[in-house]
């Protein structure tokens, strides 16, 4: 009976995601649609790349005028474009049967919906490994998969969606390694995550560093007689295997970039040159004003532009070109949710440390996960201060998975607190969990069908 109910919930979990994601993916406009601006951020500029691949059957170098963003003077094709390659070649196949612009756009967007669906499945696998209580396991799964902004990322043409899938793969691989030990299966999971991350999104490269550090540390073992030993043989065996798979997966792209872009592996230097040459004055690197160039401090930037508030609200949910927001109560509810999670996580750490000594391996694992949370935050603030002010919460989404793990673990520990030997009654805990589910699922349904859908229906699927 329990297995049957598990399958039902799992099916509803995936179908709910698909219903919400497809509603957005099939109805939101592509081109700028003032004054409502229901179109996703920069999708029209990103979509140029799969369109180019569909038309010519080859990957653009990023130097072609056809894929250049007119105002900014550079192309997203200079960056890692693996998701666009997948979209472009599938579009090329679909174009054999129809030349409909709508069908081709849907094809590209549905690739990212598929990435989101795969991520939802892996999040379910992670939940099974880290939560024994079914209630909190499902709360974790829904918190990750149904966060409005996270779901939104899987509905339009971008590289963020593939990146989020890659972070789930890497976290799952690390959990399996630390629970079951290293083997070929876990090595392939890790390799796949690293490949997708390396070929999709720079902001998540911290996960690759974390994977390397945690992999190397795994082979450091404490001996019963005291001291430590290191299994060099096994580390080299699996390390070389993972490195070989990763190099096969990503080597072609960086070799190509080195040749095509005159040694510019990441495309950043070429982007700078193109922006200087072609960008309009307001966004040209030579004339563009940043908070750093104007002599402001980071804290003055925070105070003047409400940076942290903007990041939080758009991390929870901001559809369109950051033009469609949820109810104010949605963001207030998430503030309470995160506050409860943080307090619970800290209490858990204090009480857990009092009961038993935390091993060095556990400390190192959690420090790495915290690093994966804070690195995207640091990079977002750094770029906003030094390069181009954009306090968009979507840049923080690589931190979503470990962040939600600690939040749900914290809420779980809050529910287990005892006073004079007495714990909260089960009905009260269940009521609290139900409220969390209401915030997560109800808030997302409200965002999609009450806030966003009327905008999409009013503007229509504008293609150009």
Regions found by a protein language model. Give the residues of each.
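Membrane-interface alpha helices of multi-pass inner-membrane proteins
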Residues: 186-202, 248
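Transmembrane-helix motifs of polytopic, lipid-linked glycan transferases
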Residues: 106-130, 169
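Start-transfer (signal-anchor) and selected internal transmembrane alpha helices
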Residues: 1-28, 220, 231-245, 350-367, ...
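Membrane-lumen/periplasm interface segments of specific transmembrane helices
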Residues: 237-345, 446-451
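Transmembrane-helix signature of polytopic, membrane-embedded enzymes
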Residues: 99-102, 123-146, 165
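Short acidic/glycine- and proline-prone juxtamembrane loop motifs at membrane-interface regions
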Residues: 149-163
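Transmembrane signal-anchor helices characteristic of membrane glycosylation enzymes that use polyprenol
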Residues: 5-43, 52-60, 242-259, 374-378, ...
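Perimembrane helix-loop-helix junctions
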Residues: 176-179, 207-246, 260, 270
